[in-house]
């Protein structure tokens, strides 16, 4: 108890975002199920038949699911389900990753293909699709919707065959098995798995990202849930009405054609498909702080530390798909899982129905990005507009459109840009930086000889510490001035060329002004007056 109080005092002193202290394991949120009035606005959808373990084998659901202390599907139940499907369907292959979680749990995944392709040898002229769930362990409709998709494909062979004519699919249903075991958001070490995509603090993050980079998908989805009971308004009597919130990748260093494809084709179709299923949706948002009396909601941001943008920076179409479920235990679970299933099926069907447009747009976007000499974007802003957002009154379950200020990232507006270097030079004393880049799928050439010549260097003019302690570091905001100089670096230095598909991940990591850069997270520590030890080659 003394230790717990000590941690609580630390968290309260470090900032408002540290709402409570964490312990080892079982960091579970409070359960507040919907009242009967609110629950009436989220009825079961007639004709729903979900082909996943929680619904086909209800006897396997742990008791703790009903009170919010457990998810519905244990690891062994999930693995047995996946193995049975693979045995019965030649186009489904069950795999276990060659790495394990922080507590030694396995990562089973399914590879779906109508040909003899594999991750290492993909089919030619087919879309590669990566689907993941269970990133946060207390969001069970995320991985359950992935299992429901597998069951649906097995039950609808013609539909599966139609999809697999045009794509190969990798399904990783449970990204965070330790978090699922403890029914907590975090990894076993209490790092947030969805905030570790650039700093790469945990080996588990690196292992999964290396698998992702090897597969090199054209399309990816990340299945989550959002807090059901978050209340707004002067009386705290209105909540989000949506069953589903979704967002594409927003970072401005993603090819514009790929971002436009996400918004104008996939997002529009997804909204229509959600409504056709009798469900409600809105764009994914978080609450912001506003100086006015009007509620400010911020659309999903551009920060690369989040999986949606980190995956998108490999120049692919990515969607974060969220369903209404955190904090309500097993309530409405069928409707929640259906919401996730509808979204992922919409993405797959849209890709197949528009295969030529989707495949060619993404491939052209990759080539355009790889060969581009356009400036890169280091910081951006979200312009604020007025709009309405679907809300539900908790006193009488009235559905209505609520006026809000909306900080939009469709698109964000660039603030600080810089010329795109042809390469970065990294001294041999920083092999850990190179290793991180290689995890991203960025190639680095080790120079057999010394490098002597002109470079662009960055002199640090300002380092401002943020007010909060975040996952072991106090992050910084760094400002620099670009200068030209001649440099001599020894043999064994690294040259990272930027005419490669995943170079945008190098941009956000290596340019110190970026909010998620290695400098910001102290991976490359700098102080005012220093010269940043990574150099740009023009």
From Swiss-Prot:
Lineage: Eukaryota, Fungi, Dikarya, Ascomycota, Pezizomycotina
Cofactor(s) of this protein: Zn(2+)
Localization (cell): Secreted
Coiled-coil stretches noted in the UniProt entry, renumbered to this chain: none
Pfam families linked: Peptidase_M14
Keyword terms, alphabetized: Carboxypeptidase, Glycoprotein, Hydrolase, Protease, Secreted, Signal, Virulence
Domain of life from the UniProt record: Eukaryota
EC numbers for this chain: 3.4.17.-
Gene3D superfamilies reported in the protein's UniProt record: Zn peptidases
Protein name: Carboxypeptidase 2
GO biological process assignments: proteolysis
Domain Peptidase M14: 71-351
Gene Ontology terms, MF aspect: metallocarboxypeptidase activity; zinc ion binding
Record region (Disordered): 53-76
Residues annotated as signal peptide: 1-21
Record family assignment: Belongs to the peptidase M14 family.
Active-site residues, as the UniProt record annotates them: 322
Binding sites annotated in the UniProt record for Zn(2+): 136, 139, 224
Biological function: Extracellular metalloprotease that contributes to pathogenicity.
GO cellular component, one term: extracellular region
Enzyme class: hydrolase
Organism for this UniProt entry: Trichophyton tonsurans
Glycan-carrying positions: 46, 393, 459
